[in-house]
């Protein structure tokens, strides 16, 4: 699909080649052998050259403190906000801890949600996934993630939830090796890419 632009001397919409879309990946787990990160890395490999997925680590973020925000926000926070701002869309994969998203992910979203009303996530297309050893796949965490994103307000992709149950049996050597699950996840990313293209089309046609 191409970029849609108006001709210089008419209102005719011209279809031009679209540049490679850039996605930012956020993992809700800090573990070295994180299953959530393994899913992201596998999608990173599978998406090329259709889209570029950069995985950003939330490891260095301090706990959210409004006193430390603003003009002199920590460098790691500024880096996160910049990475989100320059991405066309965001892909989040998180485990489920105690029926909710991980604390590190919630903390990252809290930092990214500020400044209020001017968040870099505002209107940004976001796709969420959860991965868990449990057969439920972290579905309760995903509901919480989408509620938080909608409140910012980001633009969560409206589609059937992508939950990966029994993930510990589907990951090996830091990669998602279950082909059916990988195809399932890639279908969701395709929907994210379509959401991004649709938003571009609306802006170009305005």
Question: Predicted segment positions?
Answer:
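Short, Lys/Arg-enriched N-terminal segments with co-localized hydrophobic residues
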Residues: 9-17
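Glycine-rich phosphate/pyrophosphate-binding loop and the adjoining helix
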Residues: 18-24, 65, 155-206
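N-terminal beta-loop-helix "entrance" segment that forms/cooperates
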Residues: 58-74, 171-172
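A generic structural motif
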Residues: 48-54, 154-155
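Helix-loop-strand module that forms the ligand-binding subsite of alpha/beta enzymes
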Residues: 72-153
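N-terminal beta1-alpha1 ligand-phosphate binding loop
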Residues: 19-48
